[in-house]
Amino acid sequence: RARFEEMVSRVIAYIHAGDIRQANLTQRLLGHLPAGLDPFMLYRRLRVLSPAPFSAFLTVPDGTAIASASPERFLGLDAQGHVVTRPIKGTRPRGRTPAEDEALARELVGSEKDQAENLMIVDLLRNDLSRVCRLGSVAVSELAELESFANVHHLVSEVRGTLLPNLGPVDLLRAPFPGGLITVAPKIRPMEIFNELVPPRRGPYCGGMSCLGFDG
């Protein structure tokens, strides 16, 4: 805790100095699986406890297993070149009773802080997509709409565009990566500060997973 509080203090100092406007500090928590437990069984349990539309399980050659349950679509591209990103910024827990749940949802929708942060991410993604999409095609189709999941309420926005005809999925992925939800804006200086303050490197945590198919 002391280490994390020190990181927060240093980030606040960077904000006061004008280096950044905000930062997304996190802590990586470590645990140990019981001997013999199949990581895929852990993933299946995760899907029960925290169902999400973009759940994924991946194993890599070094034996690492990655289990993810994310409600966020970072990027989508169909065969016609239509691009969509649905950033999330703004979160409240689900309530223990219907009345508490509704109150928490109203609080989130009415939060000026969460609305401002959501708008910042939308502006960042509009700029990112404009570099690889047809001129005039990038537009905000949803702004800070409330969406409720098993354990949380989120504010979700949607930005759409049409990919330039001479570009492909990899070009699209390069434009906004790493995601603005993690880096915030502007991107470069916050990433430099993360590398300085947050040991070890985040790796798959706060990263992204993708699937490329012939249908886009």
Where are these regions (language model features)?
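Extended alpha-helical targeting/anchoring segments
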Residues: R1-G216
